[in-house]
Each structure stands twice: as C-alpha cells, then as structure tokens.
A protein has these predicted regions:
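Conserved motor-coupling elements within RecA-like helicase/translocase cores
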Residues: 40-61
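A short helix-to-beta-strand connector/capping loop
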Residues: 27-29, 56-59, 145-149
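Active-site regions of enzymes building and remodeling cell-envelope glycoconjugates
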Residues: 24-30, 41-48, 83, 188-191
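Conserved helicase motor core of SF1/SF2 NTP-dependent helicases
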Residues: 2, 7-18, 66-69, 78-86, ...
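A generic local structural motif
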Residues: 45-50, 69-74, 94-96
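Alpha-helix termini
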Residues: 23-25, 75-76, 142
C-alpha cells in the first residue's frame, strides 16, 4: 500500500517522521519527504528525498498541505495513494481536506476542532460578506455535517495533570493525563488556577 501523510508545516512532518513507531521503515529507507533541509537530514539521516509526490508501494511519503494540494490540482481522474493521513487537520482549509479526498482511496483526518484553526488573513466581515465561512472553517465544516465517524481521544500522553486541568475547560472535563512528567513547583512563579 502507498501512504501520503500531509500537514501544514515541515516541522509537523518531521515530528511524524521522528515517531518511534516509524523507526523500522525509516531505517529501511521507506519514508520519503519533499524538500529536506540539511538540519532535517542530520535529524533523521535515513529520510529519503522525494522530488515529486508520487505513490511508492510499501512506503510513506511526507508532504506539506501546499505541496499536496498542488498534486491534487494536477490530477485528472486517478486516485494515486491508497491512504492519505491529514495531520493537524484543524489547521487545514476546507479545500485542502477536499484535495486529500482526491489524493487517497482512504482518508483519515487527524485533528481537533478545539485547537488552532486555519490562519486566514482576511477580516471576519470580508469572510462573511463573500460567503467564505465554510471554506475557512475547514475541519469544523467537515465534522459538523455528520457524514463521517468521529472519535475523541480522552487521554493525553504529553500534558501533565496540571496542564490537562486547564485544557479540560475546552473538553468538558473528559481529558485525562497519562504523562509520566510531573510539574515541579518553582518559587515566585504565579499561575492562575483554573477555578479562578
């Protein structure tokens, strides 16, 4: 099977490539990325350079939203990848989510509508007046119509208990911490308690 993983930034793609679950395919030179910098080459030496975003059987291709959307615009009728994974999908415009559907036979959107939405440099009045709201809502627009199954993670492995207690304001108390990290009290450092 061929897999495309797409995200807003190259840094996000490097985070994906750095996951321990991918170490074997990285070492076997089965992970390709567009536009590898010298720092990225040092960080993950076995990462392969991908000049054109093309499916490779048994491999993972990493490309930004910008690069992936360019490929989608060039497609005629074929769907090149078996799977497309859109990481940080809450940051994608609706057009990018649509492009992902053109690129993959199966598509997984990984994102959280409670997190950073797409960054748009238009005034809200212009968005409203030109009827662009659905376009800039991105993942919200896709998830609100009920056309696909949704899953909400309830455990965080990065956030310690204190951080989860603040974050739970947005998650109605449904998030719990599984982090092994513990918060150290630092004298003379002030925190606003979540209860006010």
């Amino acid at each position: 099977k061929s897999v495309l993983v797409t995200a807003l930034t190259n840094r996000a793609l490097m985070e994906v490539a750095g996951k321990s679950s991918l170490s074997e395919v990285i070492q076997n030179k089965q992970v390709y990325k567009t536009k590898i910098t010298s720092d990225e080459s040092k960080e993950i030496p076995s990462l392969q350079l991908e000049k054109d975003v093309t499916p490779k059987k048994g491999c993972i291709v990493l490309a930004t939203f910008f690069v992936s959307s360019g490929l989608a615009a060039e497609l005629a009728s074929e769907t090149p990848f078996d799977y497309v994974i859109v990481d940080e999908a809450s940051q994608a415009l609706l057009a990018m989510l649509g492009a992902a559907r053109l690129l993959g036979k199966q598509v997984v959107f990984v994102g959280d509508t409670n997190q950073l939405p797409p960054v748009v440099q238009l005034k809200k009045s212009k968005i409203r007046d030109n009827n662009y709201l659905r376009l800039v809502e991105g993942l919200d627009a896709v998830t609100n119509n009920g056309a696909m199954p949704l899953y909400q993670l309830t455990e965080s492995f990065r956030l310690c208990n204190r951080a989860v207690s603040y974050t739970n304001f947005f998650y109605n108390g449904n998030l719990s911490s599984k982090s092994k990290m513990r918060f150290a009290d630092i004298p003379n450092l002030f925190f606003m308690h979540k209860e006010g």
